[in-house]
Regions:
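Short amphipathic alpha-helix that is part of the acyltransferase structural core
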Residues: 1-31
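Active-site rim helix/loop that mediates acceptor-substrate recognition in acyltransferases
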Residues: 22-51
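Short coil/turn segments at beta-strand junctions that form active-site/ligand-binding loops
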Residues: 45, 66, 99
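Conserved beta-strand in the GNAT
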Residues: 48, 53-63, 67-74
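Conserved acetyl-CoA-binding loop-helix of GNAT-fold acetyltransferases
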Residues: 75, 81-94
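Conserved GNAT acetyl-CoA-binding A-motif
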Residues: 95-104
Length: 104
């Protein structure tokens, strides 16, 4: 079963999220992870996603009005090609059903 969990420093897989963030994006594309954790003044959603109990990846959304931008989306390298990214995008659509979604 695919599930999502809001990312916090106390999340069991916090270290995995942080490591994936650092490995999936080059330094010039990253912003300090503390900004993601703080949620951009209530406009951000930092979400880890799982297949059952297995950590698959994370996404970070920034929403203003009816516009949601996917700033970061990463899947664990060993799980790529198994539909986790597709399910993450479906989860985003479920979280923001009335919003236009942008993936840069």
């Amino acid at each position: 079963m695919f599930r999502t969990e809001t990312m916090t420093a106390g999340l069991k897989d916090y270290t995995k999220v942080r490591t994936l963030y650092e490995n999936a994006f080059p330094p010039e594309e990253r912003i300090p992870i503390r900004y993601l954790e703080n949620g951009h003044q209530g406009n951000g959603d930092f979400i880890a996603f799982y297949q059952g109990d297995v950590f698959c990846g994370f996404f970070y959304l920034l929403t203003f009005g009816d516009l949601t931008n996917i700033l970061f989306l990463a899947v664990e390298e060993s799980l790529r090609g198994n539909g986790c990214g597709t399910r993450a995008l479906q989860a985003i659509r479920s979280l923001k059903p009335d919003n236009r979604i942008i993936l840069d």
